Amino acid sequence: MPEPRSGARRPLSRRTALAATAAGLGGALTAGLAGCSTASGGTGGGVSLTFTWWGNDDRAARTKKAVRLFEKEHPGVTVRTSNAEFGAYKQKLATQAAGGGIPDVAQLDYRQISQYAGGGALLRLDEAFDKEQIRTAEMDPSFLRTGRYAGKQYAVPMGRGITGYAYDASVYKKAGVPAPGPGWTWQDFTDVNRRIAALGLTSPDGRPFTGSNDGGGNEDVFEDWLRGRGGRLYASQTRLGFTEDDLSEFWTFCDRLRKEGLVAAARDSTQAKSTETSPMGRGLAAADFTWDAPFPGYPALLGDAVHFAPVPTTGGHQGAYFKPSMLLGVGAHSAHPAQAVALVDFLLNDPRAGDILGFTRSTPPNRTIAARVATTLEGAEREIYDYAQTMEKYGLDAPPSAPPRGDVPVQIAFGRAYQRVMFEKATPRQAARELIDEAHRELRS
């Protein structure tokens, strides 16, 4: 992966940061701010910002603590915060966007960038990048492009995540198979799961214990499989990057594994909504496809024998890439874009904010802050940091830009189509054809 530019700068004082940001955004981003109100959002001449995100209680407490530090460093600026669970958050943000504007600063999912940038809800940040009002010298340039839409920057990654494979090393040892590692293949995956199934173990409710969950309905797993073969999910904002043959081959592979009893049964995969309800969490499988951020939940639930490994490869070519666990964007209609940009920069680049936020949003994109915080990590959190370092040295392909606006309904349709395969309502070929037809309609609508 490209190395970040050298020459990291010291944190700016609050006066310097706000003065530089206000000057730059006041003039250079005039076009991006056209039509925005300039009235104060606070009282007595002060500035009031809104900042919203999704996440658990720990993330909320840490984020609020970092925001209070920002307020202390910027007298006259207050930040009203709010957070919710992901489903409710997505719905509320969509309602706000439709009603006139999202908050001054909003946490965004990778799949939301095209939706809100294309809909005019996000402020362009190119000028803020160019003038270092949002400092990026300690961030990977190829990773930053995940916040781009139509060639312009609309969001900044707040955490760097990567797909992986949680597995129970004690079961692998019992089966006499090696632990998965960089370069292991889908054929290895099949062989290992066959050995585990042959142990004849049973779940707590007496059903056969399998090698892993069924990744067939998971678009992230398919993307890793596809990229490992040189493909991609999207060729453009309106075109898929894969064919019916590609998807049919993947689903045929997954379907065969399930029918042979090597991966979890259909009903168990469809019931998986969390770590606890996954086949692995329920004692039905030895492994699970997941992301680095939620991985610590597996050893917390199942014990320290659970570790994190790469997703299988095709011929040793890794399809995984570093993806933003979430991003920060500024509302296009913010009355105080300068201060909103200053808050974004503070959360990403201030070492004290980095210490407070830690790895609550996965690995911080600022490499210096990530290395600093990593010295305090233990257990599963340290394992995912070391895993990310290993994968970076392994040589991953650059991440794609944000998915197109139709990606969310395509993702939902993907899981629904594979369920038809699992419950024998369609063949892999039929389901692939149906999914591609539906995806074309969504992308062109």
Residue ranges and their predicted role:
Residues 2-5, 10, 173, 394-445:
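Conserved C-terminal helix/tail region of periplasmic/extracytoplasmic solute-binding proteins
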Residues 69-138, 173-176, 278-287, 441:
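Extracytoplasmic "Venus flytrap"/periplasmic binding protein-like
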Residues 72, 175, 259-263, 299-363, ...:
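Extracytoplasmic/periplasmic substrate-recognition and gating elements
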Residues 103-104, 135-171, 318-320, 394-404:
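A structural signal for short loop-to-beta-strand junctions that line the ligand-binding cleft
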Residues 111-162, 307-309, 377, 382:
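Hinge/lid segment of periplasmic solute-binding proteins
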Residues 154-158, 163, 187-241, 285:
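Extracytoplasmic/periplasmic solute-binding protein
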Residues 193, 237-268:
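Glycine-centered hinge/linker elements that transmit conformational signals in sensory
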Residues 293-296, 331-408, 429:
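Mature extracytoplasmic/periplasmic domains
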